[in-house]
């Protein structure tokens, strides 16, 4: 039964503090994930890591979540978002510490594995927390704003060679300890959210039904076709964005485009800098128009264009980065709030868990494949052409993401034509 939010909603100050706490949770989490890319060239030069090993550091982050995030989503439904947020941020902190301690590849990989086990379930729990407290007319805007603040962590990770130049000058390890500091901030934000949610939960703005007694795999068959098209879009899109931008882009810009570490990381950071400001705008557009499928397609089409420009036009790294940044601002702001439309409240954690599980399968495979392509093609500063197979690989995945959104738009228009409901478009995508 829904609670009367007019009488029961906590004060604005309490809600704002809770929102800020969740923002710090995700800011630190995003910084930790993106902390590998700025030191990728140093790992290659100082520790003699291959590109396959560098790719593995982010791939192994995704590996456990192929199997665990659906379970994590169910745990969020059963044990509440607040408990899972605190537990997973603590695990991420431990993983960040182990990564910083690891001068050997197996130790560093173990740290990234621990970080990954906690991180993606944390994302599911945070999304559910936002839905529980802020679902309503401006949910897409609030979700997008939270995502923007999280991406500020990624932007700071890319800019860290500039504002923490002294740490990078001392080798690969001090920047990893900086990532630990951000993990501590994430854990502090989780504690703030935990305390406030425990105190205010009975008066929340969205009273979800009790969680199911047990997970039934038949729930997978209950989700609508539109949901699975969203999953396909998610997998293809993120299999491009994070393996390229968060693993190989800075190294590619250094070796293939001749940029310094500072210049390459600054250019790469513009992808997330654009998202910090533009994502809430696109979230507001979604709230105001409800044209989910059209907005998804508009955001997705820019992704293959960005790689087409990068491959075919010399000196086009800036233009490609612009297209990538707009796409990354646009599509996620629409994609994740749209999941709520097709998921029963009692299965919301499971729905996000399924999507995140398959997303991580794509991230794992794409990181490994991209690193393998670079190694087998001899990609390096003396052979910049060796990066071409990786770029074409990401370009084809980008095209697949766009085709999924086009199919969603076609499917939705067909459903609307068949229903021909005179009372309005209600819950349909447009």
Roles of regions detected by a PLM:
Residues 48, 80, 101-107, 118, ...:
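Helix-breaking motifs and short loop linkers at transmembrane-helix boundaries and internal kinks
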Residues 105, 111-150:
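Cytoplasmic helix-loop-helix junction between adjacent transmembrane helices
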Residues 67-106:
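Conserved MFS/SLC helix-loop-helix module at the cytosolic interface between two early adjacent transmembrane helices
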Residues 3-12, 197-231, 425-430:
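Juxtamembrane intracellular "pre-TM" segments in multi-pass secondary transporters
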């Amino acid at each position: 039964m829904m609670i009367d939010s007019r009488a029961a909603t906590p004060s604005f100050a309490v809600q704002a503090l809770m929102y800020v706490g969740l923002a710090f949770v995700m800011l630190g989490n995003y910084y930790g994930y993106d902390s590998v890319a700025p030191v990728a060239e140093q790992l290659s030069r100082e520790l003699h890591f291959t590109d396959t090993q560098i790719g593995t550091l982010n791939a192994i982050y995704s590996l456990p979540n192929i199997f665990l995030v659906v379970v994590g989503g169910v745990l969020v439904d059963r044990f509440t978002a607040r408990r899972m947020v605190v537990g997973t941020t603590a695990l991420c902190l431990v993983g960040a510490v182990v990564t910083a301690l690891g001068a050997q590849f197996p130790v560093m990989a173990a740290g990234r594995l621990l970080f990954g086990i906690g991180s993606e379930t944390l994302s599911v729990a945070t999304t559910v927390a936002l839905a529980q407290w802020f679902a309503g007319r401006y949910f897409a805007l609030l979700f997008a704003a939270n995502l923007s603040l999280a991406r500020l962590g990624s932007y700071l990770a890319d800019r860290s060679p500039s504002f923490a130049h002294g740490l990078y000058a001392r080798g690969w390890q001090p920047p990893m300890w900086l990532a630990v500091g951000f993990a501590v901030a994430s854990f502090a934000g989780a504690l703030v959210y935990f305390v406030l949610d425990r105190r205010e939960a009975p008066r929340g703005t969205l009273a979800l039904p009790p969680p199911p007694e047990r997970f039934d795999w038949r729930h997978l068959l209950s989700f609508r076709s539109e949901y699975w098209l969203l999953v396909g879009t998610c997998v293809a899109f993120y299999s491009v964005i994070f393996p390229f931008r968060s693993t190989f882009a800075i190294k590619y810009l250094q070796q293939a485009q001749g940029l310094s570490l500072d210049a390459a990381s600054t250019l790469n950071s513009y992808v997330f800098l654009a998202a910090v400001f533009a994502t809430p705008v696109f979230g507001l557009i979604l709230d105001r128009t409800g044209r989910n499928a059209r907005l998804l397609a508009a955001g997705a089409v820019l992704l293959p264009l960005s790689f087409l420009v990068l491959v075919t036009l010399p000196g086009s790294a800036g233009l490609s980065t612009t297209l990538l940044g707009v796409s990354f601002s646009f599509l996620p702001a629409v994609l994740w709030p749209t999941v709520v439309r097709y998921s029963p409240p009692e299965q919301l954690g499971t729905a996000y868990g399924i999507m995140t599980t398959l997303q991580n399968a794509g991230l794992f495979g794409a990181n490994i494949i991209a690193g393998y392509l670079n190694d087998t093609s001899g990609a390096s500063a003396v052979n910049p052409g060796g990066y071409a197979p990786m770029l074409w690989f990401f370009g084809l995945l980008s095209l697949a993401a766009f085709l999924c959104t086009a199919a969603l738009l076609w499917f939705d228009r067909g459903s609307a034509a068949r229903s021909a409901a005179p009372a309005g478009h209600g819950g349909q995508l447009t």
